[in-house]
Amino acid sequence: MKFKPNQTRTYDREGFKKRAACLCFRSEQEDEVLLVSSSRYPDQWIVPGGGVEPEEEPGGAAAREVYEEAGVKGKLGRLLGIFENQDRKHRTYVYVLTVTEILEDWEDSVNIGRKREWFKVEDAIKVLQCHKPVHAEYLERLKLGCSPTNGNSTVPSLPDNNALFVTAAPPSGVPSSIR
């Protein structure tokens, strides 16, 4: 895990670390998703994301993280859900982003040699299932949600205290619970 010297972790009222991530799509059809290499395990692919900084909104944090980790900018779309990881005490706000700009060189490619690659959604799920099943759940949730073209949000607009939480499945493969 990369930790910047000036980085401050933020936590919610229940002690969960606040994180944000984006499923970055090549187009609004949402059929190809961008994954990045892990900073810890460069041969493994992950969904770009990281900690929410103080005074930062989760959507802004998600856009910042994909800029730093994947070198892309785009149109931030709907909140897919808030995914809870009990083991690591994280709550990750996962957004959909349609990529509009791809940088040739970006912060993490220069500093740590991070790579990025486009995957068909089904292939990305398979790749993520091996070592980052929580990230695969983001894409599974996307498939269960509405079609990207019908204009409906997969998550209703709710205040933080009533937000939709998807709890990560235990390694045994028990399905996620929604509370």
Swiss-Prot record:
Keywords: Cytoplasm, Hydrolase, Magnesium, Manganese, Metal-binding, RNA-binding. Belongs to the Nudix hydrolase family. DIPP subfamily. Cleaves the beta-phosphate from diphosphoinositol polyphosphates such as PP-InsP5 (diphosphoinositol pentakisphosphate), PP-InsP4 (diphosphoinositol tetrakisphosphate) and [PP]2-InsP4 (bisdiphosphoinositol tetrakisphosphate), suggesting that it may play a role in signal transduction. It is found in: Cytoplasm. One of its GO terms (biological process) is diadenosine pentaphosphate catabolic process. It catalyses: diphospho-myo-inositol polyphosphate + H2O = myo-inositol polyphosphate + phosphate; 5-diphospho-1D-myo-inositol 1,2,3,4,6-pentakisphosphate + H2O = 1D-myo-inositol hexakisphosphate + phosphate + H(+); 3,5-bis(diphospho)-1D-myo-inositol 1,2,4,6-tetrakisphosphate + H2O = 3-diphospho-1D-myo-inositol 1,2,4,5,6-pentakisphosphate + phosphate + 2 H(+); 5-diphospho-1D-myo-inositol 1,3,4,6-tetrakisphosphate + H2O = 1D-myo-inositol 1,3,4,5,6-pentakisphosphate + phosphate + H(+). A motif (Nudix box) lies at residues 50-71. Mg(2+) 2 binds at residue 65. This is Diphosphoinositol polyphosphate phosphohydrolase 2. The active site is at 68 (proton acceptor). Its EC number is 3.6.1.52, 3.6.1.61. It holds the Pfam family NUDIX. It comes from the Eukaryota. Binds 3 Mg(2+) or Mn(2+) ions per subunit. Mg(2+) 1 binds at residues 49, 69.
